[in-house]
Amino acid sequence: MTDLEIYRKRLERIEELLSELSEYSGRGAIIIVEGKRDVLSLKRLGIEGNFELATHQSLFNFSEKIARLGNEVVILTDWDRRGDILAIKLSGYFQSFGLKPELEIRNKLRLISQKEIKDVESLYTYVSKLRLKTGYCSKRDFQ
């Protein structure tokens, strides 16, 4: 497989995950991220919705507040050590409140991006770089 084919495949898989994330968002799911730059990156990729920052209060209280809303929850913390710990703790708290959070999108993004990026805030730049290398443009590029 050539580098171009590898980049195309990665971009295709990331676009599929972004589409899935957009579907969750459209159903009213709460997308949990670590910081404001994560939100900005996702919005630049065309993801709109209800974003919540998990880093400004006790995780237990945060999880309880979100669980009370009764919405689906997507955990999209960074895929570094701190983000891994945060995802595990949040997932445990949500499960104790009867919610099964979506973690697959995060896990797949981690695998696809390999060691090239480790955080959500870099996702927009990474996708833009892949689009440039493959000559691919999506309608989101022109919004």
UniProtKB/Swiss-Prot annotation:
<feature type="domain" description="Toprim">
    <location>
        <begin position="28"/>
        <end position="109"/>
    </location>
</feature>
<dbReference type="InterPro" id="IPR022972">
    <property type="entry name" value="UPF0292"/>
</dbReference>
<dbReference type="GO" id="GO:0046872">
    <property type="term" value="F:metal ion binding"/>
</dbReference>
<protein>
    <recommendedName>
        <fullName>UPF0292 protein Mbar_A0484</fullName>
    </recommendedName>
</protein>
<comment type="similarity">
    <text>Belongs to the UPF0292 family.</text>
</comment>
<keyword id="KW-0479">Metal-binding</keyword>
<dbReference type="InterPro" id="IPR006171">
    <property type="entry name" value="TOPRIM_dom"/>
</dbReference>
<feature type="binding site">
    <location>
        <position position="78"/>
    </location>
    <ligand>
        <name>Mg(2+) 1</name>
    </ligand>
</feature>
<feature type="binding site">
    <location>
        <position position="78"/>
    </location>
    <ligand>
        <name>Mg(2+) 2</name>
    </ligand>
</feature>
<dbReference type="Pfam" id="PF01751">
    <property type="entry name" value="Toprim"/>
</dbReference>
<feature type="binding site">
    <location>
        <position position="80"/>
    </location>
    <ligand>
        <name>Mg(2+) 2</name>
    </ligand>
</feature>
<keyword id="KW-0460">Magnesium</keyword>
<dbReference type="InterPro" id="IPR034141">
    <property type="entry name" value="TOPRIM_RNase_M5-like"/>
</dbReference>
<feature type="binding site">
    <location>
        <position position="34"/>
    </location>
    <ligand>
        <name>Mg(2+) 1</name>
    </ligand>
</feature>
